[in-house]
From Swiss-Prot:
The fifth BAG domain is responsible for the interaction with HSP70 nucleotide-binding domain. It comes from Gallus gallus (Chicken). Keywords: Chaperone, Repeat. SUPFAM superfamilies: BAG domain (SSF63491). The gene is BAG5. Residues 9-86, 95-167, 182-260, 275-350, 365-442 form the BAG domain. One of its GO terms (biological process) is negative regulation of protein ubiquitination. Binds to the ATPase domain of HSP/HSC70 chaperones. GO terms for molecular function: adenyl-nucleotide exchange factor activity; protein-folding chaperone binding. Co-chaperone for HSP/HSP70 proteins. It functions as a nucleotide-exchange factor promoting the release of ADP from HSP70, thereby activating HSP70-mediated protein refolding. This is BAG family molecular chaperone regulator 5. The keyword Metal-binding does not apply. One of its GO terms (cellular component) is cytoplasm. It comes from the Eukaryota.
Amino acid sequence: MDMGNQHPSIKRLHEIQKEVKEIEQQVAVFSGLSTDRDYKKLERSLTKQLFEIDSVDTEGKGDIQQARKRAAQETERLLKELEQNANHPRRLEIEAIFKEAQALVEREITPFYQGGNCVNEEFEEGIQDVVLRLTQVKTGGKVSLRKARYRTLTKVCAVQEIIESCAKRQLSLPLSNDAHPSVSKINSVMCEVNKARGTLIALLMGVSSNDTCRHLACVLTGLVADLDALDVCGRTEIRNYRKEVVEEINKLQKYLDLDEEANSTHAYDLAQNHSILKIEEIRKKLKEVNSLLLKTENASDLYLGSKAELQGLIAQLDEVSLGKNPCIREARRRAVIEVQTLITYIDLKEALGKRQMYAEQTAAEHQSHKAVWTVLGNLSQIQQEVISFDGNKTDKNYMRLEELLTKQLLALDAVDPQGDERCKAARKQAVKLAQNILYYLDMKTDEWEY
């Protein structure tokens, strides 16, 4: 319909709907909480549009009434979506884990403020645990949750990097203040760098109310300027010391732009990430090998070629760039386990086949050793089922497989090697295999996602 011939009220509704459409894009990617400033801003904007819609005069005309009703419903839908994004159980789970990390940082950050850089084991392990738990939060592919998880991980992983660098790498110096007049100044700057490191951790984790990223950037720039002004001509060891301290400052400066990076879509939308796409491409090839092996009745002829192909896939996975994203690291780890499981399946099938071929030689084996191989034969059949299984933990088949594997572990526990070293080694390997199959079954059904 020509806009020029439209009723003024319809025109006005179209204008409002256009503004609402612009707000909709912000609502879709909103990853904060209902207490955030951006939440309040979006809520006010949408409420204002509702008032604007309500004030449109319908003049009692049915078509205008219907248009106004549709516009109001769409705006109310966005208000509800905004509220749901902010109060989603998984979003609250992310926040709860982050608050634990904040409490940990507040407890452990004091040594930095005092100019030291000593990191205790509890701090390191606590941050590692937080990273792991954040990667396990299920987003269901929801953009707002993916973004919230990634933003939180970006901050916590930065803190993890900072404290790991303290724990693993001490500067080869400081030198004694008596070595050169400049050394005293460099040592005092290094002390300030340690304090800045503590401030940076506090800023990243949102536990500092006295500092800002801008102020910290100015402080770090000032420290570099102080170091540049020092006269260290002719003293290689002092020049190297200064260089090391400047490098420490540069490392801290790169973390100040993290929030902006965590906001970019390519970062948190891992479905479009190059490394994830590469992993998925490798997993697709793995499924083809898997399908061929499991569907072919006499697959022994395929074993050699399949193993070579699978080992090639492991090599390709080793080349995948992880960046600093623990979700990509976890995706690669899981893909490696999938490939290794299939290689183990082939190895066991080949070993069982050889035993059948040389049945006369195995007849004289120790009874306990034979018992272990009987269990290994059972495990091979169960492993084939586990590899094919595509259900979840509530499936009867899952519970049946879990029970079968537990029975095999109990059977191995009942085997008495009677001092036979070969039997001891075989039983140990069989137990490890059964545990790995159980772990793989659990991994397949834990509903992990990027």
